[in-house]
């Protein structure tokens, strides 16, 4: 299938690369199918989660461990069933990240990560969800040391 990305332009993606988010993402419930896009030859740990349903919807994501963060949270039985997980090892956890400001590198302008609503993806089953953690909000800003 052919997708349009405002970041990478037109791209051909096989159907077996599509990740289904049955409930969509909060605020983007109409977007239920996504693909992970990565610039060829790039060694960055940030991927683009591009909606197949709406070309204007895309999120930069990375693994929390790439930011030096390790954390745990529990999934409900319903969430495990939605993902089709047989074991925790099948789950990939990612966080949505965004740059502060308009110019400069993420390290110099600040990189914000949403740790209170991680994405959980069953890589083999190609199903995902966004787990909203209902506790005090937390925003972590990473800045380059002077």
From Swiss-Prot:
One of its GO terms (biological process) is regulation of translation. Keywords: Bacterial flagellum biogenesis, Chaperone, Cytoplasm, Translation regulation. Pfam families: FliW. GO terms for cellular component: cytoplasm. It is found in: Cytoplasm. Its main location: cytoplasm. InterPro entries: Flagellar_assembly_factor_FliW, Flagellar_assmbl_FliW_dom_sf. It comes from the Bacteria. Belongs to the FliW family. PANTHER family: FLAGELLAR ASSEMBLY FACTOR FLIW. Interacts with translational regulator CsrA and flagellin(s). Acts as an anti-CsrA protein, binds CsrA and prevents it from repressing translation of its target genes, one of which is flagellin. Binds to flagellin and participates in the assembly of the flagellum. This is Flagellar assembly factor FliW. The gene is fliW.
């Amino acid at each position: 299938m052919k997708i349009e990305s405002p970041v990478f332009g037109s791209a051909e993606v096989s159907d077996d690369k599509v990740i289904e988010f049955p409930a969509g993402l909060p605020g983007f419930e109409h977007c239920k199918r996504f693909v992970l896009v990565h610039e060829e030859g790039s060694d960055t740990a940030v991927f683009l989660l591009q909606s197949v349903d709406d070309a204007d919807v895309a999120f930069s994501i990375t693994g929390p461990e790439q930011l030096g963060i390790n954390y745990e949270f529990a999934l409900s039985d319903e969430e495990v069933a939605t993902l089709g997980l047989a074991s925790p090892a099948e789950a990939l956890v990612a966080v949505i990240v965004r740059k502060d400001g308009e110019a400069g590198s993420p390290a110099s302008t600040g990189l914000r990560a949403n740790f209170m609503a991680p994405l959980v993806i069953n890589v083999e089953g190609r199903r995902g969800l966004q787990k909203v953690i209902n506790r005090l909000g937390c925003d972590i800003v990473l800045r380059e040391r002077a």
